[in-house]
Amino acid sequence: MAASAGVVLAGGRSSRMGAPKAALEWHGSTLLARTVGILGRATGGPVVVVRASGQDLPELPKRTVVVDDPRDGKGPVQGIAAGLAALDGLADAAFISSTDMPFLHPAFIRRVLRVLDEREETDVALPVARGYPQPLAAAYRVRLAPRAERLVKEDRLRPAFLFDECAVERLDDGALKADALIAALDPDLDSVLNVNTQADYTEARARPAPAVTVQLFGALARGDAGRGPRTVRAATVDEAADATGLTFDRHVTAALNGDQITRDGSTPLAAGDTVFFLSADAGG
């Protein structure tokens, strides 16, 4: 059983946006695919997407688990219940997020999950970031699924009702920024910014892709392109390859930060990542 996993709630009505948020484009991916990929990188466990019954979803990373929200219009507690129930026996804890968080950083996810890893008695690690509680950028014990389901049946649909019945540790801005990686890579806590309106989306699209470091090895390192690391703007492995004039095909492997190996060009990148591209003769 994995220590942690991810849940993305994708079944919201997107009434303020006026269009389904899951499929909105952001730097070559969709909001939902990026969020799923970031959660997969940060947790190492399965990632569950909770959708409305019959909802169309954009293409998602392989091994994504998709479950239907059994009741329409019941809000986030219903999605939390469905997502946690899908992870029963598969993980001890899950980071739960909405679908519309393009700036969510793996360092933020790991910091929040670490609370549950270090304190068995804690049920929920709840960031209170940028002035607001963030129930859809928080970590929950999988064992809370029956409790959340009971609250839905009682029509007590706000996350605050769940928190009233749990041991909750709240993380304010200071506690989050005390983490060295968050301080360096997400100092403004942009991880919790979501995209609710067309204006939000326009602003999010105007932001540049994350700054990442790229380095080539083996045969790929020959010539000017291979002379040491370089910084590029890229939101996916494919974009990082394109920025160096590299074709990311079956002859090339990428290693993220020296450990996570991927051959999937859609793998999302975050600020501060280092992408090592390896050719076959370098062990790729």
Language model features with spans:
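Glycine-rich phosphate/pyrophosphate-binding loop and the adjoining helix
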Residues: 175-210
